[in-house]
Structures are given as structure tokens and as C-alpha cells.
């Protein structure tokens, strides 16, 4: 099989860099965080400029952590460090991301680019090395220099013989190497480099697709490095342990430990999921009562259904996840009333066990009436009315295009004419929203106490547009 060359390119502190450039500041020298200070100081920073990161502030710190760290820094400085807190502008970041994607298209076909996130791409550069008569490092620098000249934003890149090695070269090797004068870091590795340089690297969570849960289970078995996974995988007893502990993911874990990755760019482009879903999630700015949480779920469902209609899709199931606030178990009075199981949340804090449930609609549908009715019944069935809610997730499952949905025999219990009228109303609502904005037409539920629909309509991905 032909050896291939892959690039992974990550725009450096992308959101922060956009804010710096738009203010005429040097992204590498300015002190800036992207965070919505209007919420609370507990809000997570979406980005931190490299100059602030150099003081030990993490890229996903909470705003109060930034405030505390800067106070500590200023105690030992004659001139106080001053920084900018920039509110998120998601629409602007997406605009710049599209501009940068157009730069990639000047050199690379869309068939050989996989957009991994708003600030990160994978590129199969194999055929372009011959086309441009250059090596992978030269091509990578050409792309990054064009991005820098056009947008003022720099990048970090990894080059590898497969997608995994390109990603690891970028995430670990490049980010621990010295930058050039423009802050650019590029590293290149093959399988043997990977084993030599990274088999003993810690923490293991630095590696792509290894989260804290996986690392914890590995450490309980005495495994702390990728090299140890590779060596243990040669023994039948250990191989059995991996598959028993991680299921089908064990195969990928072992492959990655050896620096192997069978997936190619062509595989990514050919992939079509067997089933699909649409989902919406909200982390609430403060703990919500059950009654207020019910309003939020109603709003989320109605927006998801409009998304179905706009995309000409149908769903047949809804799944609801309710995550409760930690104060339900830390507040003495509330703790007395709660007798249910306690688990640890994402941050390791004690909280009531989340509620989870699903409802089938009995048909493929995009009816707001049918789906909202099922959602409210589900919420009432699984939500604990005495607990405060902090996070909600709603998922519409088994989504298919309307033209691929199997026909359904009409029955005496469904008002097909009413569903048709509702569909025309949905189409009208979408047309008004397209012309005049998402808040041009609202429902009564959007004005109830605790509702966030109007605010969410002005956001992209849960952040200010």
C-alpha cells in the first residue's frame, strides 16, 4: 500500500487570536481571554491568548481562575498586568474560519480536507507533494504562511504517515517544541519516531481519544503510558483485559498504542452513519427549579423540531437527560430531603444521579404537537420535582430524510389534516425567521419566567453570536 502523508493544522488560540487581530493587537503578545463576563465568574473561558497562557492559565480556565491568577501575578510586578475580557462572537469566528478554509482550497481539493472543528483540519497531502514538487514541511509552511499573511493568525501543525500520527505530532510533539518568530510550530513523525519519542510520554490523556475515564481504568491496572499498552497487548491475558474493559474501542486503543491508524481520508469522505440524531444541550447559568426546567425543555424541543422541518427530516424517538445541581447534596436542608443515589459530576463534585429517559412517537414525524407532547410527558415522568436542575440535553433519534421515510398507513386516531395545517405553520415560521431573525416570531412560553429562548436565539453554539 502506498505510504501517505497527512497534515493536522490547529489555529493557535483561535477565538482569542481573532479578537486580538480585530483590535489591532499582536495575538502572541496581547493579554486577552474570550469569556462572557455578563454570566458569572464561573463561566468557562473559550480561549486564552498565548501570552496569558505563559503565566500558567489554562486554555479552558474559568473566569474566576483567571482573575485570581492575575491577582497573584500582580503581587510580584511593579507594573500591573492588565488583560482584556472579550465577549464571544461566534458568528465572527465562523466567518474567519470560512475565510481560512478558502485559503486551504487554494492549494488542496475539498476531497482531501476534513474539517475537524472550527479551528482544526486534517489534510491528505500525498498527491500534492508531487504536484508542488516539495516536501510535507514546505507545503505545511506555505499553508500556514498564507493564513498568517491573510488573517494575522498563526498555527501549529503535525505531519504523519497516518491521521493519528499527524494529530499526535501536532498535539504533543509540536506543542512542546520551540516556535519560530511567528509562533509557528511544525513537527513530523512516523511510527518509529512515535515509539521512540512518545511511548513513555505522560500524562496519557495528552493522546487523542484518551479521556480521564479511560486513563483511570488503565492506571487501576498499572498502565500509565502508550508503550505499556503496546507491550501488554502482545500477551493474550492483557489483550483479553483490554477488550473486556473497553469493548470494541480496545482495538483502536491498541492500534494507537503502536502508532497505527487504518482510517484514511477516503474512508472519512465515504462514511455515512447508520442512524442519525439531532440534539440540543444547555448548561444553565444558575440552578433551575423543576418547573423552570420544564420550560427550558419545551423551548429546546420546539427549536429542534423547527430544525427538523428546515432540513426536511423526521424522527421517531426523543431522549432526555437531566443533570442536577450540586447544591442538592451540599446544602444541608436540601440534603436532608434527598434520599436518592449520589454520583460525581464531570468535575468530581457530588451531585444527585442524573435522570434519563426516552419516548417513542409511534411514527416518523416532525410535528411540534406530537414531539412536544411526548417530551413533556417524558420530563414529568423522569424529573425529580424537588431537585434543582443545572444541565439539560434533548436528543431526537433515528432521524431520516423525509423522502426516505417509509410510508405509514393512516389511522382513525391521528388528525392528518391538523398535522398538515401545523406543517404549513412551521414553514411560515421558518420563512419569517429567515427574513427577519430568529426572534421575529415567538411563543408565549418564550416569555415565561426562566425562559431562555430569546437569549439562545441570539447565540451560536450556546455563546454570543
Regions found by a protein language model. Give the residues of each.
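Residues that scaffold, gate, or flank divalent-cation-dependent active/transport sites
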Residues: 1-118, 122, 255-257
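DNA-contacting surface of Y-family translesion DNA polymerases
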Residues: 8, 206, 216-388, 407
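Short, conserved phosphate-binding/catalytic loop or strand-edge motifs used
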Residues: 117-124, 161-166, 232-233
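Acidic, metal-coordinating catalytic segment for phosphate/diphosphate chemistry
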Residues: 18, 348-465
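Long, highly charged, low-complexity intrinsically disordered interaction regions
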Residues: 143-202
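Catalytic palm subdomain of template-directed nucleic-acid polymerases
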Residues: 122-144, 219-222, 234
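A glycine-rich phosphate-binding loop feature that marks nucleotide/adenosyl-phosphate handling sites
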Residues: 161-164, 255-258, 314-326, 388-400, ...
